[in-house]
């Protein structure tokens, strides 16, 4: 099993990943903001993303690890499923109990949980997860999918998303989490197995 896994999210600070070559297995989320060499898979959790792929408006790179909503989309669109079946590495349907429902479990959560639970990584690097640190939900994926980023939705999303990270850090207490960001003023309490690497351009 891999010692280190890098999950490349779609927030502004994902760019720091590109500064130098990185050792370890790489997972992307939806459509990554740049090309990732030696990528293990792209993770997809959204019904909307599958619809955009089906319409020919997006083409996530590499093989795909898909969640329950993409699985449902494939079941209800069998021709589409046949067309993209060679791209699907697997359907991964696990969800931790601290994610109340699948809509609270975003693509970053999904990719991280897959790396932890399925791949059994010992160290997990998180790049471009700006919403843990700042009130910033800008995402490269928004260029592909029209997302509601209004103030009420921003508040709801950060209220739902951040507690899941806290629970995940506790759940996998023997894993070292490395959060890469432009500052260390994180908005949640973090346990001893989580450290912040402050990156500069």
What are these regions (language model features)?
Residues 1-201:
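Metal-ion/cofactor- or nucleotide/acyl-coenzyme-handling active-site neighborhoods
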């Amino acid at each position: 099993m891999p010692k280190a896994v890098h999950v490349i999210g779609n927030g502004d600070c994902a760019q720091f990943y590109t500064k130098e070559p990185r050792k370890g297995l790489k997972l992307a989320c939806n459509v990554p903001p740049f090309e990732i060499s030696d990528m293990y898979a792209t993770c997809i959790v959204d019904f909307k993303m599958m619809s955009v792929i089906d319409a020919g408006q997006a083409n996530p790179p590499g093989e795909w690890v898909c969640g329950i909503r993409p699985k449902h989309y494939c079941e209800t669109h069998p021709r589409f499923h046949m067309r993209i079946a060679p791209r699907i590495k697997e359907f991964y349907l696990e969800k931790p109990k601290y994610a109340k429902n699948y809509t609270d479990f975003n693509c970053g959560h999904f990719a991280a949980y897959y790396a932890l639970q399925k791949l059994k990584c010992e160290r997990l690097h998180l790049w471009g997860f700006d919403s843990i640190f700042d009130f910033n939900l800008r995402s490269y994926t928004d260029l592909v999918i029209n997302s509601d980023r209004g103030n009420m939705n921003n508040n709801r999303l950060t209220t739902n998303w951040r507690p899941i990270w806290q629970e995940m850090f506790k759940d996998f207490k023997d894993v070292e989490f490395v959060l890469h960001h432009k500052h260390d003023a994180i908005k949640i309490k973090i346990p001893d197995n989580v450290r912040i690497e402050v990156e500069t351009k």
